[in-house]
Amino acid sequence: RATICGLGMENDINNLMALYVAGLCGIGYGLRQIIDAQRECGVQTENIVISGGAGQHPFVRQLLADTCGLPVLATQCSEPVLLGSAILGAVAGNIAPSVTDAMKQFTHVDKYFYPQANFQSLHLRRYEAYKQLQQTATVIRE
């Protein structure tokens, strides 16, 4: 389910871009929420690996790094589904002993995107607002 807060009736390019960025931030905050839940269970996440789709654009990669507060590693692969199939095929064909080994052999980091310190407090405030809106939306649906 999604909640959109503050949506106006403006239809100019600036408002459309702002809505797009807000949507991407929502995806980033949702990912951050998952990472936080994993951390509470003892699973430490050091970085996010991204490839394919919208994740190919540098703006999306940087925004995810900023909203999650973790480095985003962009791979050289433009077709991650095919790469995944090749990795599994390498293991099945005994070319690699394990999926982990095949991943190390077939994947390579192309670029790194680090969280920008000057946006840290902004995204922390918005992340807290995101969680509050999420709780409010849950109450409304009950």
Predicted feature locations:
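Glycine/Thr-rich phosphate-binding loops that ligate phosphate moieties of nucleotide
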Residues: 1-142
